[in-house]
């Protein structure tokens, strides 16, 4: 960043501070990851200068012959990665990918069945504060109060009752596997479209460690970061018959020019995900997640559903008499980054919450194995049991520093 350092020291200094934070902290926010240096290089390339409204071979601007190569690479790699007939890599985010699908087959006021946000869903799955809940008539399904897991018979009953035009499967805070085949059966029974938002688990799906929704869903959306370990962005997968309508929904429907530097970075990340090393990485994610859940529970910290099948888990703080807001703050002070999160049947506000969400994708990228993640579980437990004990917190902070020093992040930057 030699040019930035010379020309804009304020921005340069802020970026360096953030790099220092990422290096020094144990990053456990489930939606975050550390991209490779080559993904960052693509993001910072001259492609940021190029406007390319339209699609490869059908642009509204001249001079697109080389960005066409990049977008074709991204689309082809995405289709290969997930076994899809069609891929659109232009959505700027997962939210815009979801918006485009809704825009393709729904009319304002149509009924959609989606997962309750506090039970693990997402804002774009019908939250009243989101465009989805404003434009469409979303009705909810959730998890069982006893197991905190999806009960597919309850989903079926809701579908039969409300007769939705679309069912949305997928979650932002659900630690167990989702059976997309069962969702397909329910959708077929009521004549609904099925959209799967696999944003959190896309990397695990690509690695063959979670059921692939693409064969079952009419539309599959995802972000390209999180477990897929690419740049921040979105993507839509579907059968070839939807190509024309979905393309129009993205452009000119809800977006203008695509971000070609981001699409290049997506292509790089998809190429990485096609390698055997990526499968090994995702296998380590699962091992780490299970070890973290096991360690927390052994140290009297409540883990919802008793464990995890993916990269994340939810901690229930009610037995400890804590709030997510308080726990997030103190954990951050000792160098452990998590986010407060609502839990099923929540009694606190979304700004306070009764839980925290913890994910291991980023630390696994950093090289943490089961031995290291067990240490992380012990550190979290010590903080949660000693939230106001300055001596314990100081000791944890020192041990966090020792642990992160063992696993250098971006040493070449």
Swiss-Prot record:
InterPro entries: PyrdxlP-dep_Trfase (IPR015424), PyrdxlP-dep_Trfase_major (IPR015421), PyrdxlP-dep_Trfase_small (IPR015422), Ser_HO-MeTrfase (IPR001085), Ser_HO-MeTrfase-like (IPR049943), Ser_HO-MeTrfase_PLP_BS (IPR019798), SHMT-like_dom (IPR039429). GO terms for cellular component: cytosol. It is an enzyme of class 2 (transferase). Its cofactor is pyridoxal 5'-phosphate. Its EC number is 2.1.2.1. The keyword Lyase does not apply. It comes from the Bacteria. It catalyses: (6R)-5,10-methylene-5,6,7,8-tetrahydrofolate + glycine + H2O = (6S)-5,6,7,8-tetrahydrofolate + L-serine. Pathway: One-carbon metabolism; tetrahydrofolate interconversion; Amino-acid biosynthesis; glycine biosynthesis; glycine from L-serine: step 1/1. It is found in: Cytoplasm. The modification N6-(pyridoxal phosphate)lysine is found at residue 226. (6S)-5,6,7,8-tetrahydrofolate binds at residues 117, 121-123, 349-351. Keywords: Amino-acid biosynthesis, Cytoplasm, One-carbon metabolism, Pyridoxal phosphate, Transferase. The record marks 225 as: Plays an important role in substrate specificity. One of its GO terms (biological process) is tetrahydrofolate interconversion. PANTHER family: SERINE HYDROXYMETHYLTRANSFERASE, SERINE HYDROXYMETHYLTRANSFERASE 1. Belongs to the SHMT family. Catalyzes the reversible interconversion of serine and glycine with tetrahydrofolate (THF) serving as the one-carbon carrier. This reaction serves as the major source of one-carbon groups required for the biosynthesis of purines, thymidylate, methionine, and other important biomolecules. Also exhibits THF-independent aldolase activity toward beta-hydroxyamino acids, producing glycine and aldehydes, via a retro-aldol mechanism. Homodimer. This is Serine hydroxymethyltransferase. The lineage of its organism: Bacteria, Bacillati, Bacillota, Bacilli, Bacillales. The gene is glyA.
